Amino acid sequence: MIMSSKEVEIIWHQIISEVEILMDQEPELAGFYHAYILQHDSFDMALSYILSNQLSNKVMSTVFVRDIINKVYIACRKIVAYAIQDIKALFNHGLVHCYSFSLLHSKGFHALQAYRISNFLWCEEKKSLALYFQNRISCLFSVDIHPASMIGSGIVLDNAIGITIGQTSAIKDSVSVLSQSLALLGSAFKISSVQCPKINEGVIIGANVAILGNVVIGEKTKIQACTVVLQSVPPNSIVTSVLAKIVSFKNINE
């Protein structure tokens, strides 16, 4: 369900209130809070400012990157609503103590919002620009999300280092990755028409999980840490296993 513009405004004003309190508590950060939050008239303007300062470089200036992001937000307001839902998901899981923390400090949140820009550009056939954003996301956050992958709203990427999401992956709403190193990739050695996993709504994924191949993870499934998933999982399951199989062996004494 996409949030209304009124709901977005409610969260934005809550963020402003939180930042004003934080600024009173630590006035040394007044310039930081003003630049990132208080000088902006809307949530999407603040988010585009934050992302553009991260994704720019010496060739692609901050002003140029911000102009691209602002145009995306104007063309697709759904992306802004998704960002708010992602912030709420982090808060509702108890991973942050206030809404403003995610917007200001969460690299998983920032990587996800930058992916949403790249996905829009990819769908608009601006694939080289989308791949530029993918590369910047990978370099900055150690997160590799293909621009063509499909990711819903209310997504939690906590401690996002090492997350890899392949081109044909699909992640529905309210999916949580509660620690680092998730791999959603096609099966190895199958080059043509590689199909990546499909993750249904409400799935919770632990640390260091690999989900490989054309598999479907049923809704509200919990995948525990250090699990390798190679086959589809029915809804409402709890999955735990570490798979290893010798595919060839050479006697070193031969």
UniProtKB/Swiss-Prot annotation:
Pathway: Amino-acid biosynthesis; L-cysteine biosynthesis; L-cysteine from L-serine: step 1/2. GO terms for biological process: cysteine biosynthetic process from serine. Gene3D superfamilies: Hexapeptide repeat proteins, serine acetyltransferase, domain 1. It comes from the Bacteria. It catalyses: L-serine + acetyl-CoA = O-acetyl-L-serine + CoA. GO terms for cellular component: cytoplasm. Transmembrane segments: none annotated. PANTHER family: SERINE ACETYLTRANSFERASE. Belongs to the transferase hexapeptide repeat family. This is Serine acetyltransferase. The lineage of its organism: Bacteria, Pseudomonadati, Pseudomonadota, Gammaproteobacteria, Enterobacterales. The gene is cysE.
